[in-house]
Regions:
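Alpha-helical propensity feature that highlights long, continuous alpha-helices across diverse contexts
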Residues: 1-118
Length: 118
């Protein structure tokens, strides 16, 4: 596993733990159970956030996440369904509830921590 992969898995799994602790309604599958396209996208997103071209706000990160999910064939749905590729968070960040908005802040800060992973 290279540094980019280690960083992405760290951010993803730490975010999952925080989701559980915060009792958020959606907590996705463990890293190893996600499909390869998702893992590639996450590796790229975390690598960007750990580099010079990082996005500077959780709102920008969320918009980027929505674009990436659309590219992978996902669409808005009232519930998260992996088989149907629907997700209720595929809306602008401002339309999400506080708990769901906090996920983007958590991801943003976890990427700052991940920069230290060598």
């Amino acid at each position: 596993m290279n540094r980019a992969e280690r960083r992405a898995e760290f951010v993803y799994e730490a975010a999952r733990l925080e989701n559980t602790a915060a009792h958020r309604p959606i907590n996705p599958e463990p890293w190893g159970q996600r499909d390869p396209a998702f893992r590639r996208n996450m590796i790229q997103a975390v690598a960007r956030q750990c580099g010079r071209n990082r996005l500077t706000s959780p709102a920008a990160l969320h918009a980027d996440w929505v674009r990436a999910y659309r590219t992978m064939g996902w669409r808005y749905g009232s519930s998260r369904n992996v088989q149907a590729k629907t997700h209720p968070d595929m809306v602008p960040l401002s339309r999400l509830g506080r708990k769901e908005q906090e996920k983007d802040w958590v991801f943003f800060m976890l990427c700052e921590i991940a920069k230290r992973i060598t």
